[in-house]
Structure formats: C-alpha cells, structure tokens
C-alpha cells in the first residue's frame, strides 16, 4: 500500500500472534502520515470482529499508529472529556489492502477522570503460553508498556489535550469540505 494521504480512507486490520484475523475497521480517515506514523480518525466506523459480529464506533476517536513503538493509541472524544484505549501491539505495517498490526492483548485504558487501568493481563499470559511468545517478545512488550506509561504521565503526543483538539479540528474541516 502506498502511503495514504490526508483525507484518504483506509482499512485497519488487527491480527493475533498466530496470524488469525482479530478485528477490522472500515473507512478510517487519514489525517496525517509521516515516515513512521499514521494519525487517523474513526467516527461511526464499521468494525467487524473475527466471529463475524459487527458494530459501529459511537464517538469520534483519533487513532495513532507508529512503525517503531509496540503500541497504538485510540483517543475517544466524549462529551465529558477524552478517554484512551491503548493496545500493546506490533508496530504497524501496510500493504495494498490495509494498515495491519498484531494485537498482543495487554491494554491500558485511561478514563476521562485520569484513572489508568491495565486490562487483559490474564489473556496476555494465556496467549503467551498458547501461542509461544518468545522471551524477547515478552521483554519488548513489557518495556513498551513502560514507554507508554511515561507518555501518559507526561501528556506526550496523543495524551495531550492540544493534540486531540488539533486533530479533531482537522477532521471536522476535512469532513465538511
């Protein structure tokens, strides 16, 4: 897939370590691309689960993917503030069909009041055994949890209110063209 440009719509696919498709988002709008990162927005985006169930995202969400970090970030813009869902995942890669990454189960959720919660630790441990995650992979993921927490605590990138506001404003401008 050639690098998408601002205003393009792309498909995002998450996989599990064993190569099975986990979840697909249709029509994510690209807001910015750089050599290493893609910023987009999901707003009433169709999501298809691996079992065929479908649902639509409820609110606008700024999505951040990077080629060097082992996480991606979803900033969900709600009436009472921004909440975040962070997936520990492989750096993204793209082909002619979609932006793709491997989801490694561990998640961090940040609520609008700032509360942070690690999620799915048991699922990660179960899949680590079942899918034979290497010690190196386990180390990388745990180190990137530390990097992610430093970003959260320091309001870096997507965790800055200004960042969310800038990209949401750009989305509204593109949507209303």
From Swiss-Prot:
GO molecular function, one term: nucleoside diphosphate phosphatase activity
Enzymatic reactions: a ribonucleoside 5'-triphosphate + H2O = a ribonucleoside 5'-diphosphate + phosphate + H(+); a ribonucleoside 5'-diphosphate + H2O = a ribonucleoside 5'-phosphate + phosphate + H(+)
InterPro entries associated with the record: DUF402, FomD-like_sf, Ntdp-like, SA1684
Amino acids binding Mg(2+) 1: 87, 103, 107
Keywords: Hydrolase, Magnesium, Metal-binding
Enzyme Commission code(s) on record: 3.6.1.15, 3.6.1.6
UniProt-annotated binding residues for Mg(2+) 2: 105, 107, 120, 123
Cofactor(s) named in the record: Mg(2+)
Active site annotation, chain numbering: 23 (proton donor)
Record Pfam families: DUF402 (PF04167)
Signal peptide from the UniProt entry: none
Domain of life: Bacteria
Entry similarity comment: Belongs to the Ntdp family.
Function: Has nucleoside phosphatase activity towards nucleoside triphosphates and nucleoside diphosphates.
PANTHER family: PTHR39159, UPF0374 PROTEIN YGAC
Protein name: Nucleoside triphosphate/diphosphate phosphatase
Organism: Streptococcus pneumoniae serotype 19F (strain G54)
